[in-house]
């Protein structure tokens, strides 16, 4: 990335930064400070059949077929109103992660979303940190914002832990 952004928000999911820091992002945007929101877990679901748990979440979110595309469009519109740029990484939300050689999904219930991080996700913060360092080289003048993990969601905890690497 060639542009300089003095304020970079790490948003675990689409809408997290907007909902938690929207006021500050807007202040920075109208002041011409060019905030950037990087959404880490904004990837599309896998092509294979979705679990019953994921299907129930998609139905609750109101668009069982195109939920990620709909959420991306909503997030993009909200960030435009706030005056922020955005970048999306293609890591999937925890509800889609897993399968691999065992066929196991890592997070298959509401309780699991707020429980322990699956052992297979243990290396994810380091991988994300490497990706982010390539996108935004460390340097003076950049303030990085990360979630406080209120609520204890797995993806929020993974996002916070990557800044301690």
For each predicted feature, which ranges?
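Active-site rim/loop-helix segments in enzyme catalytic domains that contact anionic ligands
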Residues: 1-121, 125, 129-139
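Short, well-ordered beta-to-alpha junction loops that form the rim of enzyme active sites
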Residues: 12, 89-92, 146-156
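Active-site histidine-anchored catalytic micro-motif
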Residues: 18-27, 147, 153-156, 160-161
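Proline-aspartate-enriched helix->loop->beta-strand connector
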Residues: 84, 141-145, 149
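Conserved small/polar residues in nucleotide/adenosyl-binding loops
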Residues: 164-165
């Amino acid at each position: 990335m060639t542009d300089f952004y003095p304020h970079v928000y790490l948003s675990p999911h689409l809408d997290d930064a907007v909902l938690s820091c929207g006021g500050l992002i807007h202040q920075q945007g109208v002041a011409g400070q060019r905030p950037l929101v990087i959404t880490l877990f904004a990837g599309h679901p896998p092509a294979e059949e979705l679990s019953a748990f994921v299907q129930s979440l998609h139905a609750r979110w109101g668009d069982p077929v195109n939920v990620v595309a709909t959420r991306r469009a909503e997030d993009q519109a909200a960030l435009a109103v706030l005056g922020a740029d955005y970048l999306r990484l293609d890591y999937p939300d925890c509800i889609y992660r897993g399968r691999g050689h065992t066929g196991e999904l890592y997070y298959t219930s509401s309780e699991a979303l707020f429980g322990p991080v699956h052992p297979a996700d243990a290396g994810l913060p380091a991988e994300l940190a490497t990706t982010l360092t390539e996108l935004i080289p460390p340097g003076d003048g950049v303030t990085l914002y990360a979630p406080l993990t209120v609520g204890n969601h797995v993806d929020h905890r993974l996002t916070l832990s990557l800044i301690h690497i």
